[in-house]
Amino acid sequence: MKVVLFYDQGRAHSVAAICEVLCAQGCAVTPHAIEQVWNDTSPCSTPLALVQDATHVFFLYAHEPMRDPAFIFFSGVACGRGMHVLLLATTTEVRDIHVFRDLVFLLEEETFEDFFRVEHERFVRQKKKRVARTALLERGYPCFEENFIATVMDGNIDIVNLFLDAGFSAALKDARGTPVLSLAVREGQDEMAAQLIARGAPVDQLSDDRAYSALMEAAQIGNRTVARLLLHAGADPNVRGSNGQTALVLAVGRKDHVLIRLLMDHGANPYLEDKLGLSAQGYAKLFNDPTLCTLVGV
């Protein structure tokens, strides 16, 4: 983030302190005295060259800036190039500016440091997105949701990280309403599931088809590794699907003693009944399995 600071002599005494504040917020600052800009005849330092690589143009005036042709020129150039134009409102004259009000951000002395902190964070995020999108295109992955979903199912962690850096959400669902985390679990992509969780995928997000959470998907296929990972990430073991079943019921149905113990240790409720009126305890009794009954507290 490169800030070009234009100031008049009335505010020259403040420049060093303001530059120090902006540098502390991660901004590269280049100050220019307005009075000298128009007198500089060096061929390598034309007025346009001063803002060539700038992302923000920041004005610091002791008087009403609309009287200054430099303000009109540089703010116009900045707006035309899509740059942010900032003006520190230090006097009543400056605060009362009406022309360009829709194009210029008026900052207060008490809050401009916070503005640049937030702005720098936003700039870094946007730059990260641009870099990631360029990298995706260079590797042959146009930035479409379908491509993101396909790479999740393929287990391509490097490309998925680029999609996430490019602004795609770890909470995205496919066309059928299945969250990408659940897709990774269904496809047996354990490392992908771990990465999505680390990047903020909601662990209790439900699929639209059967209202299963990722933990229920893991329980259905007996994936203890992912089940443990999800539980450690705070997954609710008592989420119920459209049929009323829980991850514990599914684990009992598989007679998976290790998974049952894992779920019980994380607060799974063995009394919750499905739409058939059977709970995990009920199924354990139905199977007439003493070990299952013991595990679920019968």
UniProtKB/Swiss-Prot annotation:
Transmembrane segments: none annotated. It holds the Pfam family Ank_2. It comes from the Bacteria. Gene3D superfamilies: Ankyrin repeat-containing domain. Keywords: ANK repeat, Repeat. ANK repeats lie at residues 143-172, 176-205, 210-239, 243-272. This is Putative ankyrin repeat-containing protein TP_0502.
